[in-house]
Amino acid sequence: LDLRPGPGTAHRQAERARTIGSVLTSILNAVVWIVATAMVLGEFGFNLGPVIASAGIVGVAVGLGAQTLVRDILSGIFMLIEDQYGVGDRVDVLTISGVVERVGLRITTVRADNGTLWYIRNGEILTLGNASKK
């Protein structure tokens, strides 16, 4: 039994780390801006109670309207964490056979054998065959 990492493992791990780092950076930036804005408004004497209540209502409305987007992003996060496939892997997904060219949080692009570039929402990927993983 050979447990050594295969060729390209370091590049694949670096790509995953870069993507996950980008997600965490975006989340942290959003949190910092929201907290800073709330603190500045509080210093100017604004009553933040109604603002927070309104933000909650807007959050529910946006959440209901963006269910597909949220599903795609969550699927992308789990796909990255579970390392289901990566750039350069040969995959069969939906009715497409080809090579993964880009993996994003929302969309994965696959170059089909006939040369067509397919953009697949991560939330649509229910089953996937990865010929590159042994």
Question: What spans do the regions from the language model cover?
Answer:
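Membrane-contacting alpha-helices and adjoining membrane-interface segments
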Residues: 3-80, 117-133
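Soluble accessory domains appended to multi-pass membrane transport proteins
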Residues: 78-134
